[in-house]
């Protein structure tokens, strides 16, 4: 099954269909993948962008989704709206995550039911940053993590992929 999209801020792609398995890579919100095999609580997937294969939990995906913007900050805090106020949550989306904007105001984009991001943290999906050094500098002092793709930890291949 092609054209599925990951719908959590970040997830591990495990080598085996168990939570404590070795990680082959990570998958970001809005990232497209193909389902290769269905197990009880797991899908074996192949990411469309970089071709990594492994297992993710079954409930972490959307079938219908068209990213129109992407996160262009190391991590972008998710806000909830209560009345006219925007309240910080403890959750983030990470650099490169794709979102579909469903509502907006002066300072925020809504991308899911009562989930908002600051406009300044996102750019059009087709935006291409010409300054490679600018992107690399975002990751100064970020620890190395096998398979990592975020500010929580990154590996060598992800550092290059994030630019492209």
Can you say where each PLM-predicted feature lies in the sequence?
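Boundary regions of SH3-family modules and the immediately adjacent low-complexity/disordered segments
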Residues: 1-2, 25, 29-34, 39-40, ...
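Second-shell loop/turn segments in exported
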Residues: 143-150
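Extended, low-hydrophobicity, Ser/Thr/Pro/Gly-biased non-transmembrane segments
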Residues: 5-7, 15-23, 32
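Active-site nucleophilic cysteine motif
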Residues: 136, 150-164
